[in-house]
């Protein structure tokens, strides 16, 4: 089974991808993991990605597509895989379709996790992280024992610039602009299923398995 996970920032795609990977016994492939893997291995792609990111640029479709092609050539994807963070655009989706066709494969389902904007803002803007050890908390869902301070090393917690409400709303707007055409692409092909992204991770997993007939 080949699954594509879509959803706004804070929708819990990564959590669901990990849970589904365990449930279905297929690898979870994320763009972030691929970037880190190539950088760690010192590949040519990894060097290109590092140079672009050091310069504050965006990784091009060509580089991202090349990473996906390399990853899908590995034997562990034979029973299927879960893509998280790719494709992000219709151009990438068309490339992926062509790549899968060349491998004699096709997408099983594109799952779109639907979460209201205000809930996304609440989820993300409530995050706090420790600048010393990297631990992440949430002011209401996973608060530290002492408000504002890390449980591990007592460092004062900080809110990332990206996690401030105004910036979360900006990211949501960008997500809508880029992803609505992608959702339409998969909907027109009869491959899109929307899943309510509100609830516990286990509850959302149960809803996901239901739409997959599992």
UniProtKB/Swiss-Prot annotation:
Residues 126-163 are annotated as: LID. AMP binds at residues 31, 36, 57-59, 85-88, 92, 160, 171. GO terms for molecular function: adenylate kinase activity; ATP binding; zinc ion binding. One of its GO terms (cellular component) is cytoplasm. It is found in: Cytoplasm. Residues 30-59 are annotated as: NMP. ATP binds at residues 10-15, 127, 136-137, 199. It catalyses: AMP + ATP = 2 ADP. Pathway: Purine metabolism; AMP biosynthesis via salvage pathway; AMP from ADP: step 1/1. CDD domains: ADK. Keywords: ATP-binding, Cytoplasm, Kinase, Metal-binding, Nucleotide biosynthesis, Nucleotide-binding, Transferase, Zinc. Its main location: cytoplasm. Zn(2+) binds at residues 130, 133, 150, 153. InterPro entries: Adenyl_kin_sub, Adenylat/UMP-CMP_kin, Adenylat_kinase_CS, Adenylate_kinase_lid-dom, P-loop_NTPase. GO terms for biological process: AMP salvage. It comes from the Bacteria. Monomer. PANTHER family: NUCLEOTIDE KINASE. Consists of three domains, a large central CORE domain and two small peripheral domains, NMPbind and LID, which undergo movements during catalysis. The LID domain closes over the site of phosphoryl transfer upon ATP binding. Assembling and dissambling the active center during each catalytic cycle provides an effective means to prevent ATP hydrolysis. Some bacteria have evolved a zinc-coordinating structure that stabilizes the LID domain. HAMAP family: Adenylate_kinase_Adk (MF_00235). NCBIfam families: adk, PRK00279.1-2, PRK00279.1-3, PRK14527.1. This is Adenylate kinase. The lineage of its organism: Bacteria, Pseudomonadati, Myxococcota, Myxococcia, Myxococcales. The gene is adk.
């Amino acid at each position: 089974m080949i699954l594509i996970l879509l959803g706004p920032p804070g929708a819990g795609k990564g959590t669901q991808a990990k849970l589904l990977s365990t449930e279905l016994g297929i690898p979870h492939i994320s763009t972030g993991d691929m970037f880190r893997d190539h950088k760690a291995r010192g590949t040519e792609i990894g060097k290109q990605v590092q140079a672009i990111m050091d310069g504050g640029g965006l990784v091009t479709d060509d580089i991202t597509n090349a990473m996906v092609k390399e990853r899908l050539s590995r034997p562990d994807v034979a029973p299927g895989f879960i893509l998280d963070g790719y494709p992000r655009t219709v151009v990438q989706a068309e490339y992926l379709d062509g790549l899968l066709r060349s491998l004699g494969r096709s997408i099983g389902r594109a799952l779109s996790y639907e979460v209201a904007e205000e809930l996304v803002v609440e989820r993300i803007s409530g995050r706090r992280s420790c600048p010393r050890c990297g631990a992440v908390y949430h002011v209401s869902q996973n608060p530290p024992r002492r408000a504002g301070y890390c449980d591990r090393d007592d460092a004062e917690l900080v809110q990332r610039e990206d996690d401030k409400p105004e910036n979360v709303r900006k990211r949501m707007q960008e997500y809508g602009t880029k992803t609505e055409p992608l959702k339409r692409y998969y909907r027109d092909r009869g491959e899109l299923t929307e899943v309510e992204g509100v609830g516990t991770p286990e509850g959302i997993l149960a809803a996901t398995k239901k739409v997959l007939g599992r």
